[in-house]
Amino acid sequence: MRVAALISGGKDSCYNMMQCIAEGHQIVALANLRPDENQVESDELDSYMYQTVGHHAIDLYAEAMALPLYRRAIRGRSLETGRVYTQCEGDEVEDLYELLKLVKEKEEIEGVSVGAILSDYQRGRVENVCKRLNLQPLAYLWQRNQEDLLREMIASNIKAIIIKVAALGLDPDKHLGKTLVEMEPYLLELSKKYGVHVCGEGGEYETFTLDCPLFKKKIVVDSSEAVMHSADAFAPVAYLRLSRLHLEEKVSSVPADDETANSIHSS
């Protein structure tokens, strides 16, 4: 099946792409929703649906995979917040509809890779959009044990760093920029102590993938800046702004030919 992958830059969307390929599907394009830069100043958008921290690096992520990237600004807001989503003009879900509609027209996709693990809210809305577009959602991580998933992601050579923290026990000064390998023991400890979701499904943390087996090149962070979003005494919310990055060749990578060269489509 020809598949477009919904990506945030994080570990979950990356690992779900790997599962799609393992099941015999072909990832032909990447799709991403970004903040409308004319309307918001912060990288962290108040969205029920989308991870936006790290959005500045998405173009490089697509270049690392040598796949076409389709992006759309999030112009809507969370208006229809009921358990079951019904089509609502001005809702942020309709931005996803317009984005995937464009990708389907351009790339003739049949399915969509979705990295949802636990959120019925997100999954139901993606399914609503896919049904309207006659696309098959592929969510291989859905309701998997999070400790198992984190272990598998690390074992699968997904190199991801923490770019947002928002939970009791996570310290911006200590944990922003740390890798999954470095954080795994501590995340397991926080899970036992405070019930923190090991994969961050409760919004406790977010990640950005710098390398994985799907990348033709790896992403290197040259400089970054910690930004305090909410200085809560017990669970401060902070994120890492990736200000300068570059791609490096991987020792075992094969250069992409002209047919798979990266192209970017924005709306």
UniProtKB/Swiss-Prot annotation:
State the pathway, as annotated in the record.
Protein modification; peptidyl-diphthamide biosynthesis
Q: What keywords were assigned to this record?
A: ATP-binding, Ligase, Nucleotide-binding, Phosphoprotein
One MF term from GO for this chain?
Answer: ATP binding
* Record field: catalytic activity: diphthine-[translation elongation factor 2] + NH4(+) + ATP = diphthamide-[translation elongation factor 2] + AMP + diphosphate + H(+)
> PANTHER family in the record, alphabetically?
DIPHTHINE--AMMONIA LIGASE, DOMAIN OF UNKNOWN FUNCTION 71 DUF71 -CONTAINING PROTEIN
Q: A Pfam family in this protein?
A: Diphthami_syn_2
Q: What is this protein called?
A: Diphthine--ammonia ligase
Sequence similarity: Belongs to the Diphthine--ammonia ligase family.
Q: Which CDD domains match?
A: AANH_PF0828-like (cd01994)
Q: What does this protein do?
A: Amidase that catalyzes the last step of diphthamide biosynthesis using ammonium and ATP. Diphthamide biosynthesis consists in the conversion of an L-histidine residue in the translation elongation factor 2 (EEF2) to diphthamide.
Enzyme Commission number, as recorded: 6.3.1.14
Biological-process GO terms, alphabetical: protein histidyl modification to diphthamide
Where, per the database record, does this protein carry Phosphotyrosine? Y97
Q: What class of enzyme is it?
A: ligase
